[in-house]
Amino acid sequence: MAIAKSVRARAVGLRSLRVLCAQRSVAREFSVLNRPQPNYPGHIPLTPIERGALAIGSAVGSLLNPRRGDLIATVGETTATPFFIYRLRDAMLADSTGRRILRDRPRITSQTLSLPYLRNLPKNTVGYTYATWLDREGVSPDTRSSVQYIDDEECAYVMQRYRECHDFYHAVTGLPIVVEGEIALKAFEFMNTLIPMTGLSVFAAIRLKPEEKQRFWSIHLPWAIRSGLASKELINVYWEEQLERDVNELREELNIEKPPDLRDIRKKVREQKKAAKEAVIKS
């Protein structure tokens, strides 16, 4: 009996030793000083602790400075896994156009899109709307950083695609890149994509001026919820094939409601303030 107990104890001890060795082996396989090979060019594998720390630090930094696009991009990547980016990928796999996009892997840059050509399209087209929006806002499709922190190679492309399509969302909604406009668009994107970063961006509204907050809560947030939920999955739009289409026709097809022109609203507010100031001076 004593011998049997001794044998069982030794067996348990050996199993525990094997588990401990396996855990140490895994730790050696993936640690700060010993990372696995990247899954695609530019990929940086992260441990769960590193991912969490990077997500929190980037979220705080982007909240303090909403113009830090690099921090916002990092928050997007580190909070999209393990569930949300797979949900978006699965939405593409469930759609015929989404599957084509995943197969073709198109990229949106100034090399893949001829901006001079788009500027000469009829004014009611998607391409003209996109190009003139870029010109008005002074931005370029080449400013989108490459995905680094998503482990799955296909999901990394999905995030890259979302990132490069962001300016098309701006163009068809007409929202400018001022902080107020970015927050409104991020709220719209959250309702449409469920990417956590887009929802977290709404907290940046606390840094808006009082009149901007009032507009956001009363006009643009209700619009974002309403339109974001009603519209089709925008990740499945093959924008490169829509450039010559009527932009209003595409909005109707995608069920996108265009919000009130934010630049026009801000301009009128400035003019009213200027007129009121001049009236005080004259009096």
Swiss-Prot record:
Named cofactor requirement(s): Zn(2+)
- Spell out where the chain crosses the membrane: none
- This chain's protein is named Ubiquinone biosynthesis protein COQ4, mitochondrial
Give GO cellular component annotations, separated by semicolons: extrinsic component of mitochondrial inner membrane
As listed in the record, the transit peptide stretches over 1-25
Output the InterPro entries linked to this UniProt entry. Answer: Coq4 (IPR007715), Coq4_euk (IPR027540)
Q: What class of enzyme is it?
A: lyase
Species assigned in the record: Coccidioides posadasii (strain C735)
GO BP annotations, alphabetical order: ubiquinone biosynthetic process
Pathways per UniProt: Cofactor biosynthesis; ubiquinone biosynthesis
- Enzyme Commission number(s) of this protein: 4.1.1.130
Q: Which residues bind Zn(2+)?
A: 166-167, 170, 182
Subunit and partners = Component of a multi-subunit COQ enzyme complex, composed of at least COQ3, COQ4, COQ5, COQ6, COQ7 and COQ9.
* Signal peptide bounds: none
